[in-house]
Amino acid sequence: MQKVVKLNNIKIGNDLPFVLITGPCQIEGKDHALFMAEKLVKLTSKLEIPFIYKSSFDKANRTSVHGIRGVGIEKGLDILSKVKSEFDCPIVTDVHSESQCIETAEVADILQIPAFLCRQTDLLQAAAKTGKIVKVKKGQFLAPWDMKNVQTKLETFGVKDILFTERGACFGYNNLVSDMRSLAIMAELNVPVVFDATHSVQQPGGLGGSTGGERKYVELLAKAATSVGIAGMYMEVHQDPDNAPSDGPCMMKLDNLESILIKLKKYDKITKEK
């Protein structure tokens, strides 16, 4: 029987209708966060898709030292708290160090471990101590079966509810490729699997001082992943991605999200028909 992670009234499982994890890459301010959350809550309510809001208070692994990192943990968590209380939606955000975990867990329902940090034992242990759901993004350098070691660490530290995320694998320099077998392989670990459709089209460092991306392939990869069968779809969105402070080339345009989600619901239903 496939593992199901429960979060409030949301059930996250590989055999269940997919959950949407979405929001802007980084927190840009209170007004922008509330604007985005309102749009996303209305859309997901209309389409009857379970929704978890995602945005980062710090982009600690920017390509360049001059890249905009975000509003910081104190201001960021305050903004996420306002989003959570105003729209009654669960929150997921990244943690980059052990010291951030307890404070972040006061607001976030899910702690996300970035792909570059997925093997950091001390960080995994600190996240585990919060008692929250821990969502780990598979490193671009890891085979999907190597996530068994991450699972063992988390379970050893007492984590009951784990989510794994596929976000592409290194394919030469400045490029990623999505191996859809990874979704099935990680699901065999009895962990709900999420597909990150926007970071999978990244071209890391591809613009020299920043990361490039091929937004035009987001929908294609999202359809492929949904056809395999996933617990969640992770897509970062922005009303004006070309002018976003980070990951603009990868993020979906907010105006295009509805049409894509309608298609993904159809793929998801067919894939999971008994």
From Swiss-Prot:
- Where does it sit, as one GO cellular component term? cytoplasm
Name the catalysed reactions. D-arabinose 5-phosphate + phosphoenolpyruvate + H2O = 3-deoxy-alpha-D-manno-2-octulosonate-8-phosphate + phosphate
Under SUPFAM superfamilies, the record lists:
Aldolase
Spell out the molecular function terms from Gene Ontology: 3-deoxy-8-phosphooctulonate synthase activity
Q: What is its EC number?
A: 2.5.1.55
Q: What class of enzyme is it?
A: transferase
Q: Which UniProt keywords apply?
A: Cytoplasm, Lipopolysaccharide biosynthesis, Transferase
Q: Which HAMAP family match?
A: KDO8P_synth (MF_00056)
Family under the similarity heading: Belongs to the KdsA family.
Q: What is this protein called?
A: 2-dehydro-3-deoxyphosphooctonate aldolase
Where does this protein come from, organism-wise? Rickettsia peacockii (strain Rustic)
